[in-house]
């Protein structure tokens, strides 16, 4: 039996009879199930050369065809690695001339950065053998780095929606002593041990790393809640997908880092897969979903655009890439450091939860969606900012702001089957507590911890190959073009456009090497091709994009590629595909 991993729907076989379930099955509209397609992997490509700085070699195989419609799935990974002994020494950056060279990675440093008290080399070799360490006049070493700096320095995989390894060096200061003022230091704090009030003078200033052009603490935080109600799991899935869509025409997804795959619906952040998996058991049509989220901003930042200093690990990997194109080696680089890098964004935290509602119990007890909505803010003591539920008012005494959290909501609302939370940012202690109990006290404590433990909650980004134009390493055009070529192939290989067609508003999912269709309410089948509820024959169905074609030949300094809204096309006046069907690029 075919099972869907996220929000899976059980398939019901058709049998004549007189039971209640069989009467439902008798209403199934006959439709032709698409032919099963089995997964195909290529043979292993040859091993890469031994990476001398890692003493490892790698090989890969391509996903020629994901399995579809119940076809045989593939087993095993697409990546493989083995230990090796390199005949050549560990590669270093080009000779540094009169400048200092870090022993381990070969990074070049200006002489004034040696023995200045900052570890500008990962191995600390620039600060070893120093008889007299020069300390800056302002003694910047007493300041902590700006909160969240190491998170903003990470690469980002647009397919997996996961952070990758560090791209920027978040600990490099370039001999500069630039600080950021924190206005919150004036707030009085209480020390229970010494029983005294004090100002947090040690948090008055934070030090800004070289790769950060701007960083500004936010004085105001957005602490309002937004809520949306979804009638079934597929409806929730669809809106999560649209909320995270990107203009580049790439299908985003959730997947293990070792085996990048695409899933066309996802939440953001590294915990998205777990968040969706917890909802998997609530896939029956009797369940509805109230999705509630709040976002708190703590800082705005912008990264340096030119003369970027790369993380030493990335620098080392970049120097090992061959000048001649090798997809396996370049794809491994993308897999490690991400498809994109962050250029600017917002720090803070996100608290999101989904209330799983048993609609049958609510109907029996006379509980309405309006009443549920009125109770949402009461559990954690804050108000509703916006709601997509038409005609719902915020006033009323159905659920007061008691601040008792999940217990308050479960007690006052009949039909709340479960509350599934996801927390991003803040201290690990309060974040863990908030996940299991969303009371006013835990919410406020978590919010206060965000200032010094934020994550990147909104950001702008660029493809990873563009970074090579803006480093301090000199010309890298050949490797940049190779990386761009590899990224196009990488994004296409693991895109959910290779799945489908999923009919009747079904959502295509590429999980590992297996394609699946998440069906909307009243639809069944491996391709959601069957109708199990009367009156849905003229149901409006949205269209889905095909994959992009290959790039055309270069003409007049540009080339183009196209895609079609036929996977499947819109039906009965359904929504056409969003986005452009044509892309151009310089060549």
UniProtKB/Swiss-Prot annotation:
By its UniProt entry, which Pfam families does this protein fall under? EGF_C8A_B_C6 (PF21195), Ldl_recept_a (PF00057), MACPF (PF01823), TSP_1 (PF00090)
Q: Which GO terms describe its molecular function?
A: complement binding; protein-containing complex binding
Q: Which residues are glycosylated?
A: 44, 437, 545, 548, 551
Which stretches are transmembrane?
Answer: 248-256, 259-266, 377-384
Indicate which residues the UniProt annotation says bind Ca(2+).
113, 116, 118, 120, 126-127
What is the recorded phenotype of mutating residue 477 to R?
In strain: BALB/c; requires 2 nucleotide substitutions
Q: How is its activity regulated?
A: Membrane attack complex (MAC) assembly is inhibited by CD59, thereby protecting self-cells from damage during complement activation. CD59 acts by binding to the beta-haipins of C8 (C8A and C8B), forming an intermolecular beta-sheet that prevents incorporation of the multiple copies of C9 required for complete formation of the osmolytic pore. MAC assembly is also inhibited by clusterin (CLU) chaperones that inhibit polymerization of C9.
Q: Which cysteines are joined by disulfide bonds?
A: 39-74, 50-84, 53-90, 96-108, 102-121, 115-130, 140-177, 375-399, 497-547, 499-515, 502-517, 519-528, 554-587, 565-577
Per the annotation, which location comes first and is thus the protein's main one?
secreted
Protein family membership: Belongs to the complement C6/C7/C8/C9 family.
Subunit structure, interactors included: Heterotrimer of 3 chains: alpha (C8A), beta (C8B) and gamma (C8G); the alpha and gamma chains are disulfide bonded. Component of the membrane attack complex (MAC), composed of complement C5b, C6, C7, C8A, C8B, C8G and multiple copies of the pore-forming subunit C9.
PANTHER family referenced in this protein's UniProt entry, alphabetically: COMPLEMENT COMPONENT C6, COMPLEMENT COMPONENT C8 ALPHA CHAIN
Q: What is this protein called?
A: Complement component C8 alpha chain
What is the primary gene name for this protein?
C8a
């Amino acid at each position: 039996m075919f099972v869907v991993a996220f929000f899976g729907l059980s398939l019901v076989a058709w049998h004549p009879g007189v039971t209640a379930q069989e009467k439902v099955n008798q209403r199934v509209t006959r439709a032709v199930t698409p032919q099963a397609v089995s997964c195909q992997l290529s043979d292993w490509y040859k091993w890469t050369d031994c990476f001398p700085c890692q003493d490892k070699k790698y090989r890969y195989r391509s996903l020629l065809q994901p399995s579809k419609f119940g076809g045989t799935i593939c087993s095993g990974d697409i990546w493989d690695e083995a230990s090796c002994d390199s005949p050549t020494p560990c590669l270093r950056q080009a000779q540094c001339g009169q400048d200092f060279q870090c022993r381990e990675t070969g990074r070049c440093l200006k002489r004034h950065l040696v023995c200045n008290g900052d570890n500008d080399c990962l191995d600390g070799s620039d600060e070893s053998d120093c008889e007299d360490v020069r300390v800056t006049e302002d003694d910047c070493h007493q300041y902590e780095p700006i909160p969240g700096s190491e998170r903003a320095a990470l690469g980002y995989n647009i397919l997996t929606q996961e952070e990758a390894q560090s791209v920027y060096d978040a600990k490099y200061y370039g001999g500069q002593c630039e600080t950021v003022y924190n206005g919150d230091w004036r707030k009085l704090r209480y020390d229970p041990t010494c029983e005294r009030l004090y100002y947090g003078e040690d948090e008055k200033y934070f030090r800004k790393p070289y790769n950060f052009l701007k960083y500004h603490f936010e004085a105001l935080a957005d602490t309002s809640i937004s809520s949306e109600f979804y009638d079934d799991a597929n409806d929730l899935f669809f809106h999560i997908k649209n909320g995270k869509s990107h203009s580049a025409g790439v299908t985003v997804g959730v997947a293990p880092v070792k085996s990048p795959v695409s899933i066309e619906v996802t939440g953001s952040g590294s915990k998205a897969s777990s968040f969706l998996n917890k909802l998997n058991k609530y896939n029956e049509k009797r369940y509805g979903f109230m999705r509630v989220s709040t976002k708190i901003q703590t800082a705005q930042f912008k990264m340096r655009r030119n003369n970027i200093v790369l993380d030493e690990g990335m620098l080392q990997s970049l120097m090992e890439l061959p000048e001649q194109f090798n997809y396996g080696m370049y794809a491994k680089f993308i897999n490690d450091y991400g498809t994109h890098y962050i250029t600017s964004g917002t720090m803070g935290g996100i608290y999101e939860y989904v209330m799983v509602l048993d609609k049958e119990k609510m109907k029996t007890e006379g509980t309405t969606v309006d009443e549920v909505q009125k109770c949402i803010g009461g559990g954690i003591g804050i108000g509703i900012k916006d709601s997509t539920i038409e005609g719902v008012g915020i006033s009323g005494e159905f659920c007061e702001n008691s601040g008792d959290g999940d217990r308050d909501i479960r007690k006052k609302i009949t039909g709340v089957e479960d509350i599934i939370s996801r927390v991003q940012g803040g201290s690990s202690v309060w974040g863990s507590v908030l996940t299991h109990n969303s009371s006013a006290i835990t919410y406020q404590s978590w919010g206060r911890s965000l200032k010094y433990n934020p994550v990147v909650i909104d950001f702008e980004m660029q493809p990873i190959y563009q970074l090579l134009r803006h480093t301090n390493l000199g010309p890298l055009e050949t490797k940049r073009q190779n990386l761009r070529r590899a990224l196009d192939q990488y994004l296409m290989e693991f895109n959910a456009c290779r799945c489908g067609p999923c009919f009747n508003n079904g959502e295509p999912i590429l999980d590992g090497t297996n394609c699946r269709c998440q069906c909307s309410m009243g639809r069944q089948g491996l391709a959601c091709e069957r109708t199990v509820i009367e009156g849905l024959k003229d149901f409006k169905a949205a269209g889905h994009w095909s994959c992009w074609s290959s790039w055309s030949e270069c003409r007049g300094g540009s080339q183009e590629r196209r895609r079609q809204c036929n996977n499947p096309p819109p039906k009965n006046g359904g929504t056409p595909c969003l986005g452009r069907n044509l892309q151009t690029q310089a060549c």
